[in-house]
């Protein structure tokens, strides 16, 4: 009987020692794992500072014969600006542009200070633009009346406005004065008269106004 009790006690002691060994092994395996996990977790990086949004530019132009269009496209190429063509609701024909005929459409419009030729181009939102180039041919010493229509339709207050024109001989000074009168709250800069898209003064004028792509 004593031998049986001793045997049972020996077995219980053996099982107890085995259980302790298992627990000890488990603890030794899990603790380094937690330490390794903490070591591998990279520190959080500070949030990036928001960058200033680049100024948006728009080139607006009216071109009766294609000369002003070529200059407008060159300015767009040099600056990366968006391009918008002012298209008359009623296109101008060759007869409309026959300045030798006092009754031609262009002459009649320029002789009427209140003339407001309709624009057929799709309306656009200019509010997001900081700088607006405005191009046109010179008619009767100033800009065509359809440019007045554009200025009546869109508020350029607070924007930088850069007029440019194409002309064989007439200057741009009067049209710049007219734009300043129409947009008194805009920063209307001195304009550029270009002979064509290859005119080297285009790039110089853009640079002089502190504009780059």
Describe each PLM feature range:
Residues 126-127, 152-158, 182-183:
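Short, conserved loop/helix-junction motifs that constitute active-site signature segments
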Residues 69, 73, 144, 172-177, ...:
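Short, surface-exposed alpha-helical segments at coil->helix boundaries
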Residues 1-4:
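Positively charged n-region of N-terminal signal peptides that target proteins for export
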Residues 6-13:
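Sec-dependent N-terminal signal peptides
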Residues 16-19:
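C-terminal motif of bacterial Sec signal peptides marking the signal peptidase cleavage site
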Residues 187-213:
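Glycine-rich phosphate/pyrophosphate-binding loop and the adjoining helix
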């Amino acid at each position: 009987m004593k031998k049986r009790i001793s045997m049972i006690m020996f077995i219980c002691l053996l099982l107890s020692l085995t259980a302790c060994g298992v627990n000890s092994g488990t603890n030794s395996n899990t603790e380094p794992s937690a330490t390794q996990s903490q070591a591998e977790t990279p520190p959080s990086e500070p949030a990036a500072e928001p960058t200033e949004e680049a100024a948006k530019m728009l080139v607006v132009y009216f071109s009766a014969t294609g000369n002003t269009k070529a200059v407008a496209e060159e300015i767009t190429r040099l600056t990366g600006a968006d391009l918008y063509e002012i298209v008359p609701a009623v296109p101008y024909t060759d007869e409309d542009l026959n300045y030798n005929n006092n009754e031609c459409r262009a002459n009649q419009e320029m002789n009427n200070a209140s003339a407001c030729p309709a624009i057929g181009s799709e309306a656009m939102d200019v509010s997001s633009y900081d700088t607006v180039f405005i191009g046109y041919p010179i008619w009767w010493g100033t800009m065509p009346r359809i440019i007045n229509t554009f200025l009546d339709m869109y508020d350029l207050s607070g924007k930088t406005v850069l007029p440019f024109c194409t002309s064989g001989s007439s200057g741009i000074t009067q049209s710049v004065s007219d734009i300043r009168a129409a947009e008194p709250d805009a920063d209307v800069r001195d304009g550029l008269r270009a002979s064509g898209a290859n005119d080297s003064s285009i790039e110089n004028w853009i640079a002089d106004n502190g504009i780059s792509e």
